[in-house]
């Protein structure tokens, strides 16, 4: 069967540049099952054509005048998928990406045909109105095996459960990597399972041990990683190498860059004096880079784009890249099969290693992919052999953890999906957790959650369970009830900024900062009257204070050891928690609300208060706003009446940008006058 045999308009074929190719067996079977009204679970290797299945289902749903939502586990994947699915506009569909602001209501969905969401965003929208699912005809769940992730999995499972609970008629297409219990997940979804080991680009998997490469039934001596990388790049291929730590990624990339002469003029330049710029710029011209979560979002995007466009030949990355964006390469090397964590040194899971080596082989460029796992010792050699010979671990549910039950219990009561413990238990019977474990401890945990929520003012009970104003707000704001209790205490404390930053930093949504200097944190706690307070939260508050005082990311790294990517992650969460704190003021201390709204904007933008007006202009961030301010342009009105030729003289402003910001400032001033 070819694409043209599907019976679609010719415009559908245009999505594939008019290439009327033969469908793979798993694509044909999935489309046939979907047309029979079935839910579908597709479990196939990476780059095996899952996107065509989604396109087909979305198109058929659109023809029925129904909406589709496409759910992914990570923001980076959502942006990548949005770029891909935006092509559906050529078929007349309205496509929307929504990944920010967890306080949005789902009303906007009515204006679109296809909406791409992270699982957290989808869950937060359902907190506002779960019945949005009544307008959704199709839910595509990408990377459904992520329900087995201890941290992100429960949210994805909650989204799927809520959607099916509210509207059992919503069709589901679940896309998965190869997992050993795919049939168990498919049964939970009431879905037809389409399982295949087919890869369009064949994969060869080998082991590098004691300078011997065992690959494809052959053994080759005197081989090391440098040699394999050099051979692959010289032959026109690209290489991904996975290592266990950021420092190892940086050091290895620097060493590998010395193997190659300069081949491009790539240069990264961060507006905010980023600490990694110099190191990256040493190696980028040689076609080599590192990639880890300490880099800023902009730096990571720059590296990923350069690799896709084949300007970069080698990336040395930490495992976070394997779970993120799709970056295939001819050769993938798993250099480290262990990691250091809370439990000491542990081996990577089979699933993680399979995800890494599964990226080997770039369709359209490579005839085959090569995945090589490095064994550093006799013990790891035995483990590596098991990675190759055994199936990935089964996917298990984590939605039954007490804190997840508590979060979901408040949400279900606030949404009106449950008004009693019996109804809450009924909701949990629709979860994958129940499919795997039966009742287990769930009734007890629901009972404990209800007791906790009543005692702390989130819900009340007369004839039935109902959310209080406080409980409803917390559910809509999408924050943990324990964090809400912490924030509530702030309103009985001082109203200064440092105290607010401390309470924000206490919340579980903000990961603690690994900083050695306890003395500065103790001084901070003493200054706000919390001498016996939480040292780790105080460290985070100190970093946030530097951020809103306009310290550069380089200075924050030098002072506190917080890398730009880690800073961005904490700022993003602190932005959300401070937004929530400002909203809670309307219940507990309305007179503090305006001050907290100002703090929220300062955290969001990383600015002092006097720059708040200027950063309303798109493309003007904290650095450009400060340059304008120091040049005597203090607000939007003054910018609107400025000569662009004066602005373009400032560092960081091109002629085009200067004209654009003045034009936008004029528009804002005009709107304010009306």
Curated annotation (Swiss-Prot):
Database matches in Pfam families: DEAD (PF00270), Helicase_C (PF00271), Helicase_dom4_arc (PF21280), HHH_5 (PF14520), HTH_61 (PF20470)
Catalytic activity: Couples ATP hydrolysis with the unwinding of duplex DNA by translocating in the 3'-5' direction; ATP + H2O = ADP + phosphate + H(+)
Any one GO biological process: DNA repair
Sequence motif: DEAH box, positions: 142-145
InterPro entries: DEAD/DEAH_box_helicase_dom, Hel308-like_dom4, Hel308_SKI2-like, Helicase_ATP-bd, Helicase_C-like, Helicase_Hel308, HTH_61, P-loop_NTPase
A GO molecular-function descriptor: ATP binding
Binding site for ATP: 27, 44-51
Enzyme class at the top of the EC tree: isomerase
Domain annotation Helicase C-terminal: ranges: 224-411
Listed SUPFAM superfamilies: P-loop containing nucleoside triphosphate hydrolases, Sec63 N-terminal domain-like, Winged helix' DNA-binding domain
Family: Belongs to the helicase family. Hel308 subfamily.
Subunit relationships: Monomer.
Annotated NCBIfam families: PRK01172.1
PANTHER family, alphabetized: ATP-DEPENDENT DNA HELICASE HEL308, DNA POLYMERASE THETA, PUTATIVE (AFU_ORTHOLOGUE AFUA_1G05260)-RELATED
Name of this protein: ATP-dependent DNA helicase Hel308
């Amino acid at each position: 069967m070819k694409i043209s045999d599907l019976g679609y308009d010719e415009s559908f074929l245009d999505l594939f540049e008019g290439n009327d190719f033969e469908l793979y067996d798993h694509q044909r079977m999935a489309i046939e099952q979907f047309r029979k009204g079935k839910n579908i679970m597709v479990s196939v290797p990476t780059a095996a054509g899952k996107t065509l299945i989604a396109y087909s289902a979305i198109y058929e749903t659109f023809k029925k005048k129904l909406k589709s939502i496409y759910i992914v586990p990570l923001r980076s994947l959502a942006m990548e998928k949005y770029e891909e699915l935006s092509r559906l506009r050529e078929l007349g569909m309205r496509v929307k990406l929504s990944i920010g602001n967890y306080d949005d209501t789902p009303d906007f969905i009515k204006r679109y045909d296809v909406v791409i969401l992270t699982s957290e965003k989808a869950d937060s929208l359902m907190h506002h109105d779960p019945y949005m699912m009544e307008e959704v005809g199709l839910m595509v769940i990408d990377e459904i095996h992520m329900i087995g992730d201890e941290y992100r999995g429960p949210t994805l499972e909650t989204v799927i459960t809520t959607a099916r609970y509210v509207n059992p008629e919503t069709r589901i297409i679940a896309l998965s990597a190869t997992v050993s219990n795919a049939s168990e997940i498919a049964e939970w979804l009431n879905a037809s399972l389409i399982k295949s080991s087919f890869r369009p680009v064949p994969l060869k998997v080998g082991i590098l041990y004691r300078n011997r490469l065992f690959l494809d039934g052959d053994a080759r001596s005197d081989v090391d990683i440098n040699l394999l990388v050099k051979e692959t790049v010289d032959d026109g291929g690209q290489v991904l190498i996975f290592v266990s730590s950021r420092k190892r990624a940086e050091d290895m990339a620097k060493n590998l860059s010395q193997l190659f002469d300069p081949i491009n003029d790539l240069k990264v330049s961060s507006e905010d004096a980023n600490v990694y710029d110099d190191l990256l710029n040493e190696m980028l011209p040689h076609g080599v880079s590192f990639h880890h979560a300490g880099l800023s979002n902009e730096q990571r995007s720059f590296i990923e784009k350069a690799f896709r466009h084949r300007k970069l030949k080698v990336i040395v990355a930490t495992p976070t890249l394997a779970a993120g964006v799709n970056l295939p390469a001819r050769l993938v090397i798993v250099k480290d099969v262990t990691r250091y964590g809370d439990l000491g040194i542990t081996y990577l899971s089979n699933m993680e290693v399979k995800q890494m080596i599964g990226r080997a082989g770039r369709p359209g460029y490579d005839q085959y992919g090569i995945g090589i796992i490095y064994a550093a010792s006799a013990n790891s050699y035995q483990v590596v052999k098991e990675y190759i010979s055994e199936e990935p671990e089964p996917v298990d549910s984590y939605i039954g953890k007490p804190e997840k039950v508590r979060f979901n219990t408040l949400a279900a009561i606030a949404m009106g999906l449950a008004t009693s413990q019996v109804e809450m238990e009924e909701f949990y019977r629709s979860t994958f957790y129940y499919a795997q474990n039966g009742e287990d401890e769930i009734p007890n945990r629901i009972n404990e959650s209800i007791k906790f929520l009543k005692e702390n003012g989130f819900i009340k009970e007369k004839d039935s369970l109902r959310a209080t104003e406080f409980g409803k707000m917390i559910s809509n704001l999408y924050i943990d009830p324990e964090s809400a209790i912490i924030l509530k205490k702030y309103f009985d404390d001082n109203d200064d900024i440092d105290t607010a930053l401390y309470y924000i930093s206490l919340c579980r949504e903000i990961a603690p900062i690994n900083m050695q200097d306890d003395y500065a944190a103790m001084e901070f706690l003493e200054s706000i009257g919390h001498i016996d307070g939480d040292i780790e939260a105080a460290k985070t508050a100190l970093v946030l204070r530097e951020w809103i005082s306009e310290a550069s990311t380089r200075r924050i790294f030098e002072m506190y050891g917080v890398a730009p990517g880690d800073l961005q992650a904490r700022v993003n969460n602190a932005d959300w928690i401070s937004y929530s704190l400002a909203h809670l003021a309307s219940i507990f201390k309305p007179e503090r609300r305006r001050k907290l709204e100002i703090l929220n904007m300062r955290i969001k933008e990383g600015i002092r208060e006097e720059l708040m007006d200027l950063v309303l202009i798109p493309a003007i961030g904290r650095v450009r706003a400060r340059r304008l301010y120091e040049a005597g342009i203090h607000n939007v009105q003054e910018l609107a009446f400025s000569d662009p030729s004066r602005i373009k003289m400032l560092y960081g402003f091109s002629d085009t940008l200067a004209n654009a910001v003045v034009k936008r400032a004029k528009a804002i001033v005009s709107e304010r006058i009306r």
